[in-house]
């Protein structure tokens, strides 16, 4: 039997493909407009054709993939760590209004502090290895993910929670049966919002701490005037960010549609 959700999934996939194509077109158009309106030397500013020619060389791609893999690994560590910590803290705050009133303003204020100013302290404390890189990535993910997840937990209908408790359910049971199902789509939203931030955090950690991955290579390329490789790295990272963002957006829509249909 054909699943009733198949047509909607196909529509979501088609919509995601169109959005991805539109994003790529807008980026390339903006890139070309920038090159034609700003007087920058062609030696420094590379065109889409220059990047295409660079990436068309197999040796160039072979040298870039391991660096990209390291950056994505660093980003994944920070992304997963930040999301897990945000999920735990948001659950704790959702269970306790006093804790939320005590700590949430401070956590929100921390978001206003540029990570560039904190990164040297983090590097001194945790070193230039995996721990320091993961901490920086998690730090840039944590606060926006926390606020989004907490909003989802608070969105559970009060009437449903009261019904659950009226039938003898504990606070934890009400959370599992009512609060968490309503929060799941919002948690996917948190993942979509922060996934590109985690890649930026990984690049920042590689620039300031480890010197590894594409972040470290981009710093060396800027110092060594390897502008074709630098622009190609930026394009590859941008493409990865757009693709990952669209995949998570599709998952978010699919989960939201499924949760809405089952309520």
Feature roles, as predicted:
Residues 1-25, 246-263:
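Transmembrane alpha-helical segments of polytopic membrane transport and secretion proteins
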Residues 5-9, 37-83:
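Periplasmic/extracellular loop-to-transmembrane helix junction in inner-membrane transport proteins
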Residues 77-107:
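Transmembrane-helix boundary motif in ABC transporter permease subunits
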Residues 97, 154, 185, 231-263:
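C-terminal transmembrane helix and the adjacent membrane-cytosol boundary/short C-terminal tail
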Residues 108-144, 151-152:
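Generic hydrophobic transmembrane alpha-helix motif, especially the helices
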Residues 123-125, 200-237, 256-263:
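Glycine-rich helix-loop "coupling/hinge" segments at transmembrane-helix boundaries
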Residues 135-139, 172-205, 231-232, 244, ...:
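Transmembrane alpha-helices
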Residues 148-193, 214, 218:
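Short cytoplasmic-facing helical segments at TM-TM junctions of multi-pass membrane proteins
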């Amino acid at each position: 039997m054909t699943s009733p959700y198949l047509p909607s999934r196909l529509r979501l996939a088609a919509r995601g493909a169109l959005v991805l194509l539109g994003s790529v077109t807008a980026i390339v158009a903006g890139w070309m407009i920038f090159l034609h309106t700003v007087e920058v030397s062609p030696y420094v500013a590379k065109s889409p054709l220059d990047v295409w020619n660079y990436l068309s060389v197999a040796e160039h791609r072979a040298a870039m993939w391991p660096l990209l893999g390291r950056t994505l690994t660093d980003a994944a560590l920070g992304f997963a760590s930040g999301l897990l910590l945000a999920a735990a803290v948001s659950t704790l705050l959702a269970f306790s209004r006093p804790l939320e009133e005590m700590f949430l303003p401070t956590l929100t204020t921390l978001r206003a502090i540029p990570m560039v100013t904190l990164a040297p302290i983090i590097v001194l404390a945790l070193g230039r290895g995996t721990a320091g890189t993961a901490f920086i990535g998690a730090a840039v993910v944590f606060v926006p993910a926390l606020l989004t997840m907490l909003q989802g937990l608070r969105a559970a209908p009060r009437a449903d929670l009261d019904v659950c408790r009226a039938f003898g359910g504990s606070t934890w049971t009400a959370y599992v049966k009512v609060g968490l199902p309503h929060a799941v789509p919002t948690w996917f939203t948190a993942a979509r919002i922060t996934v590109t931030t985690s890649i930026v955090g990984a690049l920042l950690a590689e620039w300031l701490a480890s010197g590894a991955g594409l972040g470290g290579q981009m710093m060396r390329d800027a110092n060594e005037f390897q502008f074709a490789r630098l622009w190609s790295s930026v394009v590859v990272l941008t493409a990865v960010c757009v693709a990952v963002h669209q995949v998570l957006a599709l998952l978010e829509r699919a989960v939201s549609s499924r949760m809405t249909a089952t309520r």
